[in-house]
Amino acid sequence: MTLKNKSIVVLLSGGLDSSTVTGIAKKSEAKIFGLSFDYGQRHKKELNSASIIAKHFDIEEFKIIKLDLSLWGGASLTDTQKNIPIDGVQTNKIPNTYVPGRNTIFISVALSYAEAIDADFIGLGVNALDYSGYPDCRPDYIKKFQELADLANKRGRENNPIKLWTPLLDLNKEEIIKLAFDNNVPLNKTWSCYSGNSKPCGKCDSCRIRNAAYEKWLNNNNKK
């Protein structure tokens, strides 16, 4: 798949994964249109990081969409009455940081935007290996959403579908960190922590997964 001179809408959260997708697209000489969401999350640090990443890669356009999912809560990321888990990643259990329907809503908005500007791809930073078990970050979800997208818009019906591009889907976090360095991603400007403190907490699932992967990458890199 070639991205050169193609238009791509990237869901840019400001975290490691979406920033890496943006870096890959930039290195591939794609025309990048970034979308972030102010969805009633606990803090705005990730939006600040997304803006910094958008400027760093000098993308074509960057939009922040206001869409308040905190109106009904249901997750510790949108409801401050719920505690963010800090006990470590638990297998076979979806944590309360999962925001109901978030990716489905975000990708649907991206699909509308992509069709409006005649973009060829939607870039997503989802990955199914080192993650918290969210149902909307899995390969079967992406496959089914692609099928839905092909039916839901004009381009799909005309056999010129907008494709979901998920270059990180089958990678672990260590591999993603390597890709980030290879594609000029300023890791110190990205934000992955679920908390909105001045520094990452180091205890939430997102911090634990990222920090463990970085240590592995660092150790392997030092052995070379």
Task: Please tell me what each predicted stretch does.
Residues 182-202:
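Immediate flanking context of iron-sulfur cluster ligation sites
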Residues 1-183:
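ATP-dependent adenylation/nucleotidyltransferase module used to activate substrates
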Residues 196-224:
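Iron-sulfur (Fe-S) cluster-binding segments and ferredoxin-like electron-carrier domains
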Residues 167, 191, 209-213:
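Low-complexity, intrinsically disordered or weakly predicted helical/coil tracts enriched
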